[in-house]
């Protein structure tokens, strides 16, 4: 008990030194859209933690190739406003080969389509009428439909998957998930793979629809909850329609 009290007192003393930054200051520091920063209401402690994360990432950029580029790390925040979110698809970390664009599972147009995304397109083609797989992995138009494509870790060193897992990006990604769960109603959360499914505790399943399956990577074999055949895209639109929201036009990638 004495140790616990010391820790509480220490945290309170330390917190006095944490910076209280305006939304504009946070935007300049972190490159996150102001609408999201206003929505998230980051605490002084969270801001301090994030500044440390950025310092670690910047240090790596000095002598290593880090993906995505600084300008694209938070592309998700500019393509889908918090008030427009209807669906959240959770990813892990960016593609370590440079194809990532700041959106979970998405790529820049010029790059080849990763195998995981090919499987996502397969499930769409199987379950959504008239869906035709596009010839690139750019998912920007889904964001404008209200689909938040969010990685839990926002950067990665080239060729080293999960290399920034311990940097502390979860301070931001977990806050985004929990804040959406608290402040919004009738969202759909798609959790694909063990990493994403572990975050279900952040979501109020009484308010939102949480759909889980194996990761779409063809390397993952799951008899219990396979990705192909999960019908998540169909079930998502049924839920949205039942709750008075417009369904997602998954076909918009080809329009």
Curated annotation (Swiss-Prot):
Which top-level enzyme class is recorded in the Swiss-Prot or TrEMBL entry? Answer: hydrolase
What CDD domains does the record tag this protein with?
UDG-F1-like
Molecular function GO terms recorded: uracil DNA N-glycosylase activity
UniProt subcellular location: Host nucleus
Q: Name one GO biological process term.
A: base-excision repair, AP site formation via deaminated base removal
This protein's UniProt keywords: DNA damage, DNA repair, Host nucleus, Hydrolase
A GO cellular component annotation in the UniProt record? host cell nucleus
Q: Which domain of life is it from?
A: Viruses
Q: Any transmembrane segments, and where? A: none
Q: Which PROSITE patterns match?
A: U_DNA_GLYCOSYLASE
Q: Catalysed reaction per UniProt?
A: Hydrolyzes single-stranded DNA or mismatched double-stranded DNA and polynucleotides, releasing free uracil
Asked if the record carries the keyword Transmembrane, the reply is: no
Documented EC number(s): 3.2.2.27
Could you tell me which PANTHER family the record lists for this protein?
Answer: URACIL-DNA GLYCOSYLASE (PTHR11264:SF0)
What the protein does comes down to: Excises uracil residues from the DNA which can arise as a result of misincorporation of dUMP residues by DNA polymerase or deamination of cytosines. Therefore may reduce deleterious uracil incorporation into the viral genome, particularly in terminally differentiated cells which lack DNA repair enzymes.
Q: Which family does it belong to?
A: Belongs to the uracil-DNA glycosylase (UDG) superfamily. UNG family.
| Stated name of the protein | Uracil-DNA glycosylase
Q: Which organism is it from?
A: Human herpesvirus 6B (strain Z29)
């Amino acid at each position: 008990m004495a140790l616990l009290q010391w820790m509480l007192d220490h945290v309170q003393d330390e917190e006095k030194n944490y910076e209280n930054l305006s939304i504009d200051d946070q935007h300049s520091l972190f490159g996150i859209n102001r609408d999201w920063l206003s929505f998230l209401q980051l605490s002084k402690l969270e801001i301090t933690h994030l500044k440390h994360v950025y310092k670690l990432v910047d240090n790596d950029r000095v002598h290593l190739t880090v993906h995505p580029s600084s300008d694209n790390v938070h592309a998700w925040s500019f393509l889908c406003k918090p008030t427009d979110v209807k669906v959240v698809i959770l990813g892990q970390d960016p593609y370590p080969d440079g194809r990532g664009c700041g959106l979970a599972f998405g790529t820049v147009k010029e790059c080849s389509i990763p195998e995981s995304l090919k499987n996502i397109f397969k499930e769409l083609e199987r379950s959504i009428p008239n869906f035709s797989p596009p010839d690139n992995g750019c998912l920007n138009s889904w964001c404008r439909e209200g689909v938040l494509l969010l990685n839990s870790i926002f950067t990665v060193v080239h060729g080293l998957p999960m290399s920034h897992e311990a940097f502390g990006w979860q301070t931001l990604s977990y806050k985004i998930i929990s804040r959406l769960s608290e402040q919004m109603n009738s969202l759909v959360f798609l959790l694909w793979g063990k990493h994403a499914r572990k975050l279900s505790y952040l979501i109020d399943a009484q308010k939102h629809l949480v759909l889980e399956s194996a990761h779409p990577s063809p390397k993952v074999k799951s008899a219990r909850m396979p990705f192909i055949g999960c019908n998540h895209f169909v079930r998502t639109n049924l839920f949205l329609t039942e709750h008075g929201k417009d369904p997602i036009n998954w076909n918009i990638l080809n329009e």
